[in-house]
Amino acid sequence: MFGYAVNLPDKLWKLFTLGEFIEGDNMYADENVIKIKHEVLYEVAKAAFDGNLDEIRDNIPFNIIPGPTPQFRCCIYKEREIIRQRVRLAEGKAPGAVDDGNIIQVISSACEDCPISSYTVTENCQNCLGKACINACKFGAIEAGRHRSHIDPAKCKECGKCAQACPYNAIAHLKRPCKFACPVNAITYNEYGISVIDEAKCIRCGKCIHSCPFGAIGSKTYIVNVIEALKDEGKKVYAMAAPATEGQFGPNITMNSWKKAMSALGFNGFVEVALGGDMTAASEADEWYEAYQAGEKKVTSCCPGFVNMVRRHYPDLADKISTTISPMAAVSRMIKAKDPDAVTVFIGPCIAKKSEVEDQKIEGNADYVLTYSEIRAIMRAKDVELEADDMSYQEGSVYGKRFANSGGVTAAVLESLKEKGIDAECKVCKANGAAECKKALLLMKAGKLPEDFIEGMACEGGCVGGPSSFNDMISTKKFRDDLLSKADDREIRANLKNYHMETFSMHRD
């Protein structure tokens, strides 16, 4: 299919060649979860193209789970209910009856069997005479049992003092994978033990999605919306591929590969969003320098997960967010400045980009966002594949292409300042991942941040490490380095002279 060899585990290679992969699960979950998720997306995409989704929607669970015996759960009825809820997500709906507006949703029927109690007494406990755990607990949550100590979950405050006090390491600290993965403590559980996402706290980063061993968390998709737009002869639909795309699919799948595949799929045009990286870098450079001269501190605005973190958890710092729009929004505005009726579709590894479209309401932004798994399901439904190609298509500089890496935004902004003849000694905190973002924002809130600016990336490694990435970071870096080494050395500001930047604004307001 691709014309080159990729070192992947056998089961992943099988899925890769079949196009059967799903948002990051190729790296984090097992083959069964991967296949089921993609089969749902494929079935919905195919039905949407065929125009019979309403007629066959109820048949999809039976097609995927034919029975008569269950494959993974207690019964085929539960398995089919899970598929039914996945179909709703694929259609852009909440899996259940209640929709809180979050793009990330828990599939309640699939959520089960994870431990609820954070601290648990294990069989290592010999009911010792010292009772250090009981003495350490200030909340009366531990009592001696017949064979071992017992922790009352209703009283436990999860302080961890008991585990620290036990000299025999008999108390284990357990967390649900989804709860442990969430960087902002947005996941709890209801009285039935089902995970619940606090919409007000959730930053839509998507870390919880690939952490669930049952695949019980997913995101709404725009698959049906995009297909309907592609089928409408009166609409011009443009695909926009994220800078993180290069390297995700090997050393020979270039932006030209994507351009040709999207054309075969029916898109009227294709733009690499690395161009938007150049646009954002130039605008951000001007904004940073103005703030630097005024002694003001700023934070970047291109990562929607980071922006959500600032607005939801550090609202006092919301005015520090750069007014410059993201590369995705920049390219979308450029396209719509030429064609006001254009439909723009962003393709990348980011779940939070869906939130940028839904929640931030930036005028002229992308209409729809697709993850790699979602666009591949659409491609599979039309028998379109990515093919190895050359590097003849390039619209962004190397700096714009490296926007997808942690530190890439900073490098591009400083390069843009340099090209403008400005030698500003700006100090930048490059916060790599949600944990570092939280630390940097806490310092800024306390007035103790030594740097002038924060480049915030909610995903470790930057966009290339997003929850919907296809490949692992090590392989992706190797492939990206190889591809980007072949790109030309155009400068950021010189490159932008080839585009009518005066026809649209680079700011939110």
Segments predicted by a language model, with ranges:
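Gly-rich Lys/Arg/Thr-decorated short loops/hinges at beta-loop-alpha junctions or inter-strand turns
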Residues: 114-120, 143-148, 189, 207, ...
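Cysteine-cluster motifs in flexible loop/terminal segments that predominantly coordinate metals
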Residues: 112-118, 128-134, 159-162, 205-208, ...
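Residue-level recognition of alpha-helix initiation/capping sites
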Residues: 128, 157, 173, 203, ...
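A secondary-structure boundary/capping signal
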Residues: 121, 152, 198, 241-242, ...
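Iron-sulfur cluster-binding cysteine motifs and their immediate structural context
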Residues: 130-153, 157, 161-198, 203, ...
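N-terminal [4Fe-4S]-dependent radical SAM core
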Residues: 96-122, 139-140
